[in-house]
């Protein structure tokens, strides 16, 4: 196809698009424009984080002008799709912007429609920067993709335009006069919806649609995303792509715009928007993606705090057992596994044996038609229920899936197993399905947690990846090896693959996930020849067992040479995957159904597992119990722990049940416990375990004589000491217990002694479990790793039978304040990890009585309560009655499903209080005193006038 040069040539220069470039030809038409602040003041009215930014709507307007120049001024409307913003164009006030637009015709689509590829770039000196790419067409309309938002009516609750623009300015984006065009803004509190009126104030005769008006429509998406409330706007959002957009060339007058936002993955949001004029004629309709952009300066300033985070110690944790597949009848993945089996069996029922993926499943279950199929323990019941029974089961399972987040994958699985054609959806639909599928592949959520525990134990790991170099495998691991604040938990990451081309994946990953070093690996060569260092790697990840070569035994020997004594080998192919997931992955990635479904090459994988076992690796849990856990994590078999045959157990003069249980557990492992007290002469050469803090912390009321004896004991001991004390860091009932922690840190540093502290609570965990954990810690003391970058662990805590260790991690001021506010609740609710506080949730089946709460601060708090679950609220004050000042606010809460009961009375009058409680429509779960006076004043001078206001 060629561009109509004659129509394009007859148009004069246009401000935004510019003049036709001399190098234009029939296959590529191009324009050049130069914009400046004097002639285009609107361009300088959008400032993002202190820098002027070219609005996304400007690219849409340029695309529309291209179509107008190809239509001989007869353009009714134009369409764009797949418009992607590659980079932001930022500039200074005095800059002149040079834009280059290129238009190339594409082949006619299946409906004989002509689309053009458009590229917009900026040029500064001799350097060109790509800004935007996409497709544009004149008078091409796909009614199936246009959202009809106007038929639902406007949203109900008003938002002040001044409040909105001031609020986003505080977040980092300032709109000038021409850009502040949203009026009569209203939002919906139950959905992410917003409406607004646009009053055009600029001359639009020079373009199809002025970019300012288009930008106003896009602005509304951010209003809808946070329901017009500043406290819900954590970060600014910007448009990063436009899936489709139709813009009319009708005269623009007063417009009403509606926007609906649906949350997506990775914090991306999808926004549908439309605009109509006063006569109800559609002017603009489309869909875009908006993405939060963090204020990096604000984030870096916020990371001024750190906290001690306690997590499970991977040394004492069965990493394999946690990867066993979850098989509940209510689990969506189990339902999809059953559906895949039933679809395959139904293909036989209806004579569709040629269906390739169903044929593959039938081959997998064999001719006997019994036994396990993925997450289905036995296929016999599904085989024996007959065609009609299978049809009924399919209906039931489809209904179960339809209401879950996996419903779209269920539809794709049905097409995969019932149709004989390849995937026919768009590339965008394919990518959305793959994005949803990817977190489920190889049980990545649980796998990431296991990897994170390893990295938490040793945040300075040296990681070696051996495999095909697939980017998705590398990204899965790299994502797990980072903290919540995006700090990497490894020292080095070496990705070795069999070919040079495969190393490009890790290179791309390194841009966003950390420093990854690529390497070409040959299993037939020695490790020294390839620059690998023996005994240097803490974690070796095998993404493809074929990377170890044809000789599994030789590959296992190489792994044994490469791994550190305390390191782990991860066989990624050993992670269990549902069969439906493997089939659907092949279907979406266009792999042949006759090829491998992605399941492991059984003999090869088993050969590697067996070879690792023969070379001294073990897969079982620390207690050597036989389990059904998958063989994923392997480590070198640890030598028998070097423990003494006797240990001194120092306890109080009274009987402590925990000590008796410790004696029994240690005795079962041939370790004799010799009981003693702090007043006895304790042999200096024997290991010591101390239990003297459980009545009263030993050092809290220590005398001078006792301190002298204590120092003599610690300074003279030649063995190891474990000091067992009540919990003080994870949760604490008596802060005096923490005194021993600081003292032991000092003595460990001053006297260079091996002193370990263990925190526990015998009232929360059974003594049998505690004694077993203490034995594990004691046996592990001699195996603690130590390097120049990482000290061994000397502090442990036992929580619900799980051994935890602390690490210092960064946090923000906001997270720290939230944590401090939740500490009081944590003291009553039991052990909690000192991590970011969980989201507050109010009980929907209970009622909350608010005393006051109808002022500005009280309304904010009550609205927040409703957003977080509260569904029954009584407002109790002398002014709590329906009226022009209160009813609109009450209706806002009612629109969110909350029953609001205002009650007029005084909290100082007991009969009023009793009557107010009788109004409750559900059991009262809380009474909140919300009366307050929002004034800053020094109460020492004259508090009486203010106290009167508070009491009211």
Swiss-Prot record:
Residues 14-143 are annotated as: N-terminal hotdog fold. Disruption phenotype: Impairs the production of terrein. GO terms for molecular function: fatty acid synthase activity; methyltransferase activity; oxidoreductase activity. Residues 847-938 are annotated as: Ketoreductase (KR) domain. Residues 156-302 are annotated as: C-terminal hotdog fold. Signal peptide: none annotated. It comes from the Eukaryota. Residues 14-302 form the PKS/mFAS DH domain. Terrein shows anticancer activity on various tumors including cervical carcinoma, ovarian cancer, and head and neck cancer. The secondary metabolite acts as angiogenesis inhibitors through the inhibition of angiogenin secretion. Terrein also has anti-inflammatory activity. It shows an alleviative function of age-related inflammation characterized as an anti-oxidant and might therefore be a useful nutraceutical compound for anti-aging. Terrein may enhance osseointegration by decreasing the level of ROS and has a potentially synergistic effect on osteoblast differentiation. The keyword Ribonucleoprotein does not apply. Induction: Expression is induced by methionine. Nitrogen starvation induces expression of terB and promotes terrein production during fruit infection, via regulation by areA and atfA. Iron limitation acts as a third independent signal for terrein cluster induction via the iron response regulator hapX. Finally, expression is under the control of the terrein cluster-specific transcription factor terR. Pathway: Secondary metabolite biosynthesis. One of its GO terms (biological process) is secondary metabolite biosynthetic process. Keywords: Methyltransferase, Multifunctional enzyme, Oxidoreductase, Transferase. Residues 15-284 are annotated as: Dehydratase (DH) domain. InterPro entries: NAD(P)-bd_dom_sf, PKS_dehydratase_sf, PKS_DH, PKS_DH_C, PKS_DH_N, PKS_KR, PKS_mFAS_DH, PKS_NRPS_Biosynth_Enz. Gene3D superfamilies: NAD(P)-binding Rossmann-like Domain, Polyketide synthase dehydratase, Vaccinia Virus protein VP39. Residues 446-621 are annotated as: Methyltransferase (MeT) domain. Its EC number is 2.3.1.-. Residues 1-25 are annotated as: Disordered. The keyword Transferase applies. PROSITE patterns: PKS_MFAS_DH. 6-hydroxymellein synthase; part of the gene cluster that mediates the biosynthesis of terrein, a fungal metabolite with ecological, antimicrobial, antiproliferative, and antioxidative activities. The first step in the pathway is performed by the polyketide synthase terA that produces 4-hydroxy-6-methylpyranon (4-HMP), orsellinic acid (OA), and 2,3-dehydro-6-hydroxymellein (2,3-dehydro-6-HM) by condensing acetyl-CoA with two, three, or four malonyl-CoA units, respectively. 4-HMP and OA are not pathway intermediates, but are rather shunt or side products. This is 6-hydroxymellein synthase terB. The lineage of its organism: Eukaryota, Fungi, Dikarya, Ascomycota, Pezizomycotina. The gene is terB.
């Amino acid at each position: 196809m060629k561009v109509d040069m004659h129509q394009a040539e007859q148009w004069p220069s246009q401000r935004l698009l510019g003049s036709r470039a001399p190098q234009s030809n029939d296959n590529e038409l191009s324009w050049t424009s130069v914009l400046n602040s004097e002639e285009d003041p609107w361009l300088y009215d959008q400032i993002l984080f202190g820098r002027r930014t070219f609005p996304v709507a400007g690219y849409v307007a340029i695309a529309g002008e291209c179509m107008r120049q190809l239509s001989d001024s007869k353009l009714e409307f134009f369409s764009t799709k797949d418009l992607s913003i590659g980079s932001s164009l930022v500039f200074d006030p005095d800059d002149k912007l040079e834009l280059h637009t290129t238009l190339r015709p594409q082949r006619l689509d299946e409906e004989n429609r002509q689309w053009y590829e458009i590229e917009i770039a900026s040029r500064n000196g001799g350097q060109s920067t790509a800004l935007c790419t996409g497709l544009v067409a004149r008078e091409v309309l796909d009614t199936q993709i246009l959202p009809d938002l106007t038929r639902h009516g406007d949203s109900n609750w008003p938002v002040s335009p001044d409040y909105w623009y001031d609020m986003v300015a505080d977040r980092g984006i300032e709109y000038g006069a021409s850009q502040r065009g949203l009026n009569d803004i209203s939002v919906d509190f139950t959905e992410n919806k917003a409406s607004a009126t646009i009053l055009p104030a600029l001359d639009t005769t020079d373009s199809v649609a002025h970019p300012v008006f288009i930008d106003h429509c896009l602005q509304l998406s951010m209003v809808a995303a946070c329901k017009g409330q500043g406290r819900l706007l954590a970060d600014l959002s910007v448009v990063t792509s436009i899936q489709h957009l139709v813009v009319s060339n009708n005269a623009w007058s007063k417009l009403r715009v509606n926007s609906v936002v649906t949350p997506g993955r990775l914090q991306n949001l999808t926004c549908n928007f439309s605009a109509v004029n006063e006569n109800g004629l559609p002017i603009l309709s489309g869909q875009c993606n908006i993405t939060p952009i963090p204020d990096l300066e604000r984030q870096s300033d916020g990371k001024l705090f750190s906290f001690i985070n306690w997590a499970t110690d991977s040394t004492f944790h069965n990493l394999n057992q946690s990867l066993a597949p979850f098989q509940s009848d209510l689990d969506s993945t189990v339902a999809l596994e059953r559906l895949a089996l039933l679809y395959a069996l139904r293909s036989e029922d209806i004579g569709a044996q040629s269906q390739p993926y169903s044929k593959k499943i039938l081959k997998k279950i064999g001719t006997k038609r019994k036994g396990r199929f993925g997450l289905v323990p036995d296929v016999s019941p599904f085989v024996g229920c007959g065609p009609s029974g299978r049809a009924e089961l399919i209906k039931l399972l489809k209904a179960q899936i339809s209401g879950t987040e996996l419903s779209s994958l269920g539809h794709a699985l049905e097409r995969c197993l019932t149709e004989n054609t390849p995937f026919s959806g768009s590339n965008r639909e394919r990518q959305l399905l793959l994005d949803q599928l990817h977190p489920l592949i190889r049980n990545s959520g649980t796998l990431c947690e296991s990897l994170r525990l390893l990295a938490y134990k040793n945040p300075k790991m040296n990681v070696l990846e051996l495999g095909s170099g697939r980017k998705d495998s590398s990204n899965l691991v790299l994502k797990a090896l980072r903290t919540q604040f995006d700090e990497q938990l490894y020292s080095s990451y070496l990705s070795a693959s069999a070919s040079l081309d495969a190393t490009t994946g890790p290179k791309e990953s390194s841009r966003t996930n950390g420093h990854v070093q690529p390497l070409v690996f040959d299993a037939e060569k020695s490790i020294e020849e390839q620059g690998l260092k023996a005994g240097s790697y803490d974690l070796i990840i095998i993404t493809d067992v074929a990377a170890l070569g044809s000789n599994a035994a030789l590959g296992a020997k190489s792994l044994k040479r490469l791994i550190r004594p305390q390191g782990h080998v991860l066989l990624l192919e050993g992670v269990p995957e549902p069969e439906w997931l493997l089939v659907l992955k092949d279907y979406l990635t266009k792999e042949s159904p006759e090829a491998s479904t992605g399941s492991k090459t059984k003999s090869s994988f088993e050969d590697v597992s067996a070879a690792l076992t023969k070379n001294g690796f073990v897969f079982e849990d620390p207690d050597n119990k036989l389990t059904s856990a998958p063989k994923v994590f392997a480590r070198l078999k640890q030598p028998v722990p070097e423990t003494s045959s006797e240990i001194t157990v120092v306890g109080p003069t009274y009987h402590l049940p925990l000590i008796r249980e410790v004696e029994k557990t240690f005795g079962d492992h041939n370790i004799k416990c010799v009981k003693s007290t702090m007043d006895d002469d304790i042999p200096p050469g024997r290991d010591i375990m101390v239990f003297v803090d459980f009545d009263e912390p030993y050092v809290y009321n220590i005398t001078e004589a006792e301190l002298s004896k204590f120092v003599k004991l610690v300074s003279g001991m030649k063995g190891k000491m474990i000091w067992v004390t009540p919990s003080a860091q994870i949760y604490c009932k008596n802060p005096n217990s923490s005194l021993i922690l600081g003292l032991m840190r000092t003595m460990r540093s001053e006297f260079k002694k091996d002193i370990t502290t263990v925190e526990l609570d015998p009232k929360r965990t059974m003594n049998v479990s505690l004694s077993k954990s203490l034995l594990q810690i004691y046996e592990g003391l001699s195996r603690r790793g130590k390097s120049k970058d990482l000290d061994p662990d000397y502090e442990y805590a036992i929580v619900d039978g799980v051994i935890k260790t602390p690490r210092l991690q960064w946090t923000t001021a906001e997270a720290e304040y939230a944590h401090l506010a939740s500490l009081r609740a944590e003291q009553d609710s039991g052990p909690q990890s000192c991590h970011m506080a969980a989201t507050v949730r109010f009980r929907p089946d209970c009622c909350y009585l608010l005393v006051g709460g109808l002022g500005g601060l009280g309304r904010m708090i009550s609205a927040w309560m409703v957003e977080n679950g509260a569904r029954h609220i009584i407002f109790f004050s002398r002014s709590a009655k329906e009226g022009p000042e209160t009813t609109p606010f009450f209706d806002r809460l009612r629109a969110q499903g909350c029953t609001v009961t205002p009650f007029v009375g005084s909290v100082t009058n007991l009969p009023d209080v009793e009557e107010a409680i009788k109004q409750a429509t559900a059991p009262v779960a809380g009474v909140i005193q919300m009366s307050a006076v929002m004034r800053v004043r020094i109460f020492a001078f004259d508090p009486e006038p203010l106290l009167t206001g508070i009491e009211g």
